[in-house]
Amino acid sequence: MRWTRRLRLCAVGAVVASAVFSPSAARAAEPSANRLTGLVNPFIGTQNDGNTFPGAAVPFGMVQFSPDTGHNTGYDYTQKRIRGFSLVHLSGVGCAIGGDLPVLPTTGDVTETDDAKYAATFSHAHEQASPGYYRVGLDSGIRAELTATQRTAVQRYTFPATRKANVLLNAGQSLHKNVSSKVEILDDRTVRTEITGSGFCGPSRPYTVYTVTRFRRPFTAHGTWYQNSITRGATRSSGPGRNGAYVTFDTTKDRTVEATTGLSYVDAQGAAVNLRAAHVSSFDQPREAARRAWEERLGHVRVRGGNAILRTTFYSSLYRSFLAPNIGSDADGRYTGWDQRIHRATDFTYYQNWSLWDTYRTQCQLLSLLAPREARDMAISVLKIDEEGGWLPKWGYGTIETNVMSGDPVTPFLTHAYQQGLLKGYEERAYRALKKNADGVPPADTMYVGREANREYIANGFAPYIKDRPFSKPGDSDYHHGGSVTLEYALSDGMLAQMAGSLGHVADAARYAARSRNYRTILDPSTGFFRARDASGAFVGPADPARSEGFHEGTAWQYQWLVPQDLRGMVALIGGERAANNRLDSFFAYDRLLKDPARTAREVWVNGPYAYYNADKYNPQNEPDLTAPYTYLSTGQPWKTTDVVHAALTLYTDGPTGVTGNDDLGTMSAWNVLSSIGIFPVQPGYPTWGLTTPVFDRVDLVLDRAYYPRGGLTITAPGTSHTRRYIQGVRVQGTAYEHTYVTTDTLRRLGSLEFTVGARPSGWGTAPEAAPPALVAEQSAGK
């Protein structure tokens, strides 16, 4: 997502891995026997704009305590200076956000106030990370260690023997724009800050975070700064610009300094509440608790088979899938709603940070499978945004809407939650919010864009592409992406039609089903491809679908498969299965792929930095194509899905460049996890899971019995490998199964899903009735 996406380097993964994990490189913590956390490498994705972070967090925690090296999203593996360890990071986003309160240990006199000037040099040889823990030896001789609880950042610094061991707390510099800040030294152990920031991929409304930092022992000196002016002994500084504080310790006898920082999006009281609730008695206590939390979370999936690199990339992806959304409510249940008022969550945990254009396609499905209780609270939190703030979100950060990206991603996010049974007791409330969103446009005086082009879409059947239309609000504009927005709106309408019908809203269901076929309105009969239309209805932009305009971060070639609500109808529209398969083969460079899958993935699919446009090939690094490999399940050639998926999986490696593009809050990581275990959500917003060959001999899923009564699912594919990857047959609970998909209802009844694999394609799944059903089949049949 966004302009900073980088493409993977074309080096062979094994060579990259060998270089990265040489003794001179940063490393994941040494694996311990039977510990899944030892298989996670947090440095994966920290180079080439995967934009992940290597620091400390617990699953879905409010705090992500991690080093910032000067990269716009925090940490870049190629940079060698740390500006500070800050509290907030979003894994894999494409624009600067967070980075609040960078802290840094130093020695000597405090003479600089700009983190770019006082940044500490370091070497990857002295850097180590594992889930919930980060350590680095700075060239200054200071060792910094970080860990985290749900709402606190815990730090331990080991200094040389000196009377001038400092900790700098920089309230006035963040990754995003810092609007104003305040720092207060309350006593000889405590520092409090208030930080207001704004901006994510452009301007946004401001938001405020509050922190309280408590040191385990008193400091011997202190001071504050404003801009370039340092005032020794001062206890307060505030206003726009750089504000910060430093505290000094004598480490001639005790070289260790420990501190815990409570974070809140509510107020200073909330930060103090969160600090007390963490009950941190020593650094090692929360470090071990974080490790146990991750061990338990990762233990929901256990795999057998595969080599060491495959297991590392898999569990590292699983780890990143659990980093967001993030807890937004304090330990006392209070949270700041999108009306900027304080509310209290009494029977759920409030979550925030919604990269919905990305996560609705993979990550929310993975969480509904492996973390349904948290996923339920996340869905309820999204409903609270509507109830308190007035509209459903598009891309929410903290307490604000950023309006980043386009379309209507919240609808498939919530309809999926409904179909998974996560909204029991909230069904009609969710439907009312979704109906309002689907049929309207947010008022002009609100911060929401919503379905901005909805009036034209409902009236004419398509969202117009108006290239130079002025922005009505901060963020992206749906009018600037009319082609892809039409497809996204239609997808959402199809998913909402299923929910409406299930709830008995028959007329609404028919209306949304009819609208879900609006993808047809932008099919240019002269080219046979989708093409944006202007306000008058004329097709606009180059006729060449590889050079199309009006498609967000993609081309008409890449968006043509984004019709999960009626893929059969789409296939018929372009000439039937044979024509569709010819297009798919060209799209994936299938003949070349068979000869050299990894090279095709890196040299044909991946074309260079910012390669969103001017392409007629599959882009495995961006969201519009995430379901595209699974299209073959609906065209009678399911074995080709396995060929493409397994080739795409070679792009995930165990080094810093090992994430395919921005990870986007776990979206690309979740794609890896789901594709690796052989079940993938092919109709985002509806509980349909496509089947493909797992890369492991056996996968054991531990499932929540409240949602999956059997409490687990075992997926087997004995002998699966690069050469034996084709499905010969599937058995469900021991019974032969010919469909290329299963539903969530089927998964709830399953204890086992068995794949038999071989060296050549078979006839499995090739019958027309084996394909996933079109969700609007009856309505589309007569059109």
Where are these regions (language model features)?
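Secretory targeting and sorting signals
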Residues: 1-29
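Active-site and channel-lining beta-strand-loop segments
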Residues: 533
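Accessory carbohydrate-recognition regions in carbohydrate-active enzymes
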Residues: 30-412, 418-487, 495-521, 527, ...
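Short aromatic-glycine motifs in intrinsically disordered, low-complexity regions
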Residues: 713-721
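ATP-dependent phospho-/nucleotidyl transfer catalytic cores
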Residues: 492
